[in-house]
Swiss-Prot record:
One GO MF term attached to the UniProt entry: structural constituent of ribosome
Protein name: Small ribosomal subunit protein uS15
Residues making up the signal peptide according to the UniProt record: none
One Pfam family linked to the record: Ribosomal_S15
Entry's family note: Belongs to the universal ribosomal protein uS15 family.
InterPro entries, per database record: Ribosomal_uS15, Ribosomal_uS15_bac-type, uS15_NS1_RNA-bd_sf
Taxonomic source organism: Bacteroides fragilis (strain ATCC 25285 / DSM 2151 / CCUG 4856 / JCM 11019 / LMG 10263 / NCTC 9343 / Onslow / VPI 2553 / EN-2)
Keyword tags: Ribonucleoprotein, Ribosomal protein, RNA-binding, rRNA-binding
Cellular component GO terms, alphabetical: cytosolic small ribosomal subunit
Organism taxonomic ancestry: Bacteria, Pseudomonadati, Bacteroidota, Bacteroidia, Bacteroidales
Quaternary structure annotation from Swiss-Prot or TrEMBL: Part of the 30S ribosomal subunit. Forms a bridge to the 50S subunit in the 70S ribosome, contacting the 23S rRNA.
Length: 89
């Protein structure tokens, strides 16, 4: 499986405030980014997989909403996370 508990724990410990921090915006954005990257690779091989395409679009929307929230709440945290993950503004 592409996203097991150990990989999630690694993402949360790297981007969250602690190992068990699963709710902070940064941790959720990092997890969504990992899933988006994986689904993008899947879509390159399976162009007609429309259910995955929809799931990918929904994940991008969720990540965008969290980024907008973080930008309004704390601009420095927003800038740090987009620089760390290599996202466009």
């Amino acid at each position: 499986m592409y996203l097991d508990a150990a990989k999630k724990q690694e993402i949360f410990s790297k981007y969250g405030k602690s190992n068990t921090d699963t709710g902070s915006a940064e941790a959720q954005i990092a997890l969504f980014s990992y899933r988006i990257t994986h689904l993008t690779e899947h879509m390159k091989l399976n162009r007609k997989d429309y259910s995955t395409e929809r799931a990918l679009t929904m994940l991008v929307g969720k990540r965008r909403a969290l980024l907008d929230y973080l930008k309004a709440k704390d601009i420095t945290r927003y800038r740090d996370i987009i620089k760390e993950l290599g996202l466009r503004k």
